[in-house]
């Protein structure tokens, strides 16, 4: 398919869940369109990965609406072992809304199918085991204004030899 600008649209990834259709563009932008034609609640996080949503809602949905609001996410101060070893999750860009987090410990250790995550702006430290075993990890996005001070165990430009990002698919 060719778009209006004449560029190929074959590289657009289209996924869906029970409520929405998600279009991921080549630059990483995701456009979400409701299947019902109703606009989504602007106070509720629209998760790309249904597995991530299920885990988050099960633990941090404090008002019982089976959704996670931006306010509920912002109040989370630790993720604990919620995602550790989960081979189902693939995307977690919504992590950026968990602004109460200051550190990521072995949060995603063993998440072998996780390939993209967005780190919240207030995270100051990432441990050596945060992404241990994330062999499909290709993209880690740091928000503008990131307060990150330490990526433990990183060894300069050669972090593939050991440390936080060893064993991932990250190339730079």
Tell what function each PLM region has.
Residues 82-86:
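Acidic, Ser/Thr
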Residues 17, 53, 57-63:
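Short, solvent-exposed loop/edge segments of extracellular or virion-exposed proteins
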Residues 70, 74, 89-102, 112-125, ...:
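Structural signature of tandem-repeat unit edges
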Residues 61-72:
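Acidic, glycine-anchored loop motifs typical of Ca2+
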Residues 41-55:
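Boundary/junction segments of secreted and surface-exposed precursor proteins
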Residues 1-41, 117:
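Collagen/collagen-like triple-helix sequence repeat recognition
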Residues 21-23, 52, 56, 95, ...:
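Extracellular/surface recognition and adhesion modules
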